[in-house]
Amino acid sequence: MKVINLFASSIITTLSMLTLPIVLTSTSIYKNKLYPQYVKTTISYAFMISMIPTTMFIYSGQEMIISNWHWMTIQTMKLTLSFKLDHFSMIFVPVALFVTWSIMEFSMWYMHSDPFINRFFKYLLMFLITMMILVTANNLFQLFIGWEGVGIMSFLLIGWWHGRTDANTAALQAVLYNRIGDVGFIMAMAWFLINLNTWELQQIFISHHNNLNMPLMGLLLAATGKSAQFGLHPWLPSAMEGPTPVSALLHSSTMVVAGVFLLIRFHPLMEHNTMMQTTTLCLGAITTLFTAICALTQNDIKKIIAFSTSSQLGLMIVTIGINQPHLAFLHICTHAFFKAMLFMCSGSIIHNLNDEQDIRKMGGLYKVLPFTTTSLIVGSLALTGMPFLTGFYSKDLIIETANTSYTNAWALLLTLVATSMTAAYSTRIMFFTLLGQPRFNPMITINENSPLLINSIKRLLLGSIFAGYLISYNITPTSTPQMTMPYYLKLTALTVTLLGFILALELNLTSQSLKLKYPSNLFKFSSLLGYFPTIIHRYMPMVNLSASQKLASTLLDAIWLESALPKSISYFHMKSSVTISNQKGLIKLYFLSFIITLILALMMINSHE
């Protein structure tokens, strides 16, 4: 009993500690220059305390639900504040706290000259808190609060530099695309309420309903919006308009993995529904390939890393599609470390080169930024799934499982091509930023010796090397069964990755001396992001607006307000007057009509007398 009390109290302490700096915003501490330090220290302590229940959970394997506040009862449905402390939430919480701790420390260096740095830290912390609410929620209502929370905080953080039009547009774009996904979430919530009369996860999972396609489609739409899957993906690269720490937090342990996490949570409903699994698998495969193609020709360092995030999210969705939610979750956890580190390395480069983001204007940075360079190389190799780095433990397993799943060879092929392309664009980043001759302004002073920068990246560097090994041993199944697959299947992931490296290196060396008169159609397709923004953001609104203008001017003004009423009345009057007053020269007829009128008048007078 004491163990259970310690478990529950330590996790509640972790979550309550995070709210302390938010509460302090009404005091003088919020105006203090040391406020960012308070926030960072709070998160570091929260991480250390969260390791207690996580360690206990790993050793005991005992799931727990804390239900400690009954909010309201609507007819037969009870709404309570309840936390689900299972395998997924207990491992995710320390990972998210560890990554955010490093990002907060990095932000103290990156945003030191910002006049509103205290507000920035408060927003980052609220972003983390809403993600924690989402992860630990045991009912759909609480999950929805966390879901909307990360949405609104992403809007505030992406549009942080609201003096720039691009930042405002990107923030609005993120909200609008997520709004489409939220429609699916609300639809699923409404369906569960009408048909199952509950929002509690346990009751939803044990209830047997014949057809769950409708709510699962809604949840898939929600995940598509939040995790930037194909169709609702353009907001993710645009979100790079926010400061680099925002990009790091947005793409590692919060927001974008929320959609994948939602599908993992509702996996018990999906595991026997083959239609939904096939849909999820195909959606993930298309996303991972399409975004990998887009990443190949981008020149903005942050955009390339953003597209790589979208590609990895597609891989996670593929994993859910082949019925492996635990592997998808493992990839979420491992991906958080190296992706946050890649963004922080790019932030270090951007900051040192006076806000230069174009990789064509970098080069030779391995001499002047040795630590950042080392971290960037390790992060890129971990992303490609290089053996025994963090990414390998999840990515290799995913490719192996897909190879032996005997379903949908088309989706598997797309995933393998995308894996190869991951190596290609990672090589491109390393080739253009770190190698060759310096192509930046020689007058720039470069300095990476700040302890805030070094320590934050160092922690994630260690995570990118060792975290995969540690997490993969504490994820189910804990004992791996004997694998019976031929060597060529076992080595597929490594082979396609090495192929991507070799091809990319060859192409990078060739492209330096290659001069094309006109860019090829494939290049245009990739650099213009598959014509998606052009069609969705330019062509379709233009067609709509021009059609509306024509309808308003032609139908309303020209026809109804002009032709139908004023012109038609005047035309009718003119026609009738012309018809009536037309002189034909029939004098006898005129006299006759005059006499008839006169006789009628006289008769009326006589009869009156």
From Swiss-Prot:
The chain crosses the membrane at residues 3-23, 46-66, 90-110, 115-135, 140-160, 174-194, 216-236, 244-264, 276-296, 304-323, 328-350, 368-388, 410-432, 460-480, 485-505, 585-605. It is a multi-pass membrane protein. GO terms for cellular component: mitochondrial inner membrane. It catalyses: a ubiquinone + NADH + 5 H(+)(in) = a ubiquinol + NAD(+) + 4 H(+)(out). It is an enzyme of class 7 (translocase). InterPro entries: NADH_DH_su5_C, NADHpl_OxRdtase_5_subgr, ND/Mrp_TM, NU5C-like, Proton_antipo_N. This is NADH-ubiquinone oxidoreductase chain 5. Its EC number is 7.1.1.2. Core subunit of the mitochondrial membrane respiratory chain NADH dehydrogenase (Complex I) that is believed to belong to the minimal assembly required for catalysis. Complex I functions in the transfer of electrons from NADH to the respiratory chain. The immediate electron acceptor for the enzyme is believed to be ubiquinone. It comes from the Eukaryota. GO terms for biological process: ATP synthesis coupled electron transport; electron transport coupled proton transport. One of its GO terms (molecular function) is NADH dehydrogenase (ubiquinone) activity. Keywords: Electron transport, Membrane, Mitochondrion, Mitochondrion inner membrane, NAD, Respiratory chain, Translocase, Transmembrane, Transmembrane helix, Transport, Ubiquinone. Belongs to the complex I subunit 5 family.
